Amino acid sequence: MKKSKYVLLALLVSLGLFSCKKDFVPTDSATVNMNGEWWVAIFVDDSIMIADYSDIGGSIITTNTAANTSSTMMIDDQNNIWPFKVQVPVDYPNLTFSASTGHLNLADSVNTIDVIDGSRIIKDGATSPSLHTTDSIVLKMEFSDDPGTIYWFKGYKDTGWPEDRWD
């Protein structure tokens, strides 16, 4: 009986020690307000839709880089569209993608991508199919394997609601 009291006491002490562990609080990335999963339609020269959300069957991801700076981001279509994956400069306070040229397409390591002026994220600028207010994105890009054609990727940020997803 005495032994079981000591075992019970040891168990209670160990539970007390481990229950005092603080909860993990993750830190935000340097580009947290621009990060996300985006459902986009694709236009040529802002007027001709060449692919709707349902045609693509996937999303674009914007995320910070390993350097975690507020001046550079990754844009990745997850092989759903072109395919492309590119690191681009951003103006984080204004939520814009800086106009810049010659970014290596990391998806194929051959072609380059130009980001055209006017690419941006608009806070609460869209209404999703489930009628939730969410951010919108406009990306204007030119690909070196299709020179002279400006592709506009326009859409909304994923809300987490199943009816807003197109995959």
Predicted features and spans:
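First exposed extracellular module after export/assembly in secreted or surface-exposed proteins
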Residues: T27-D167
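C-terminal motif of bacterial Sec signal peptides marking the signal peptidase cleavage site
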Residues: G16-S19
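Regulatory, intrinsically disordered low-complexity regions in eukaryotic nuclear proteins
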Residues: S4, K21-V25
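Bacterial N-terminal signal peptides that target proteins for export
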Residues: M1-V7
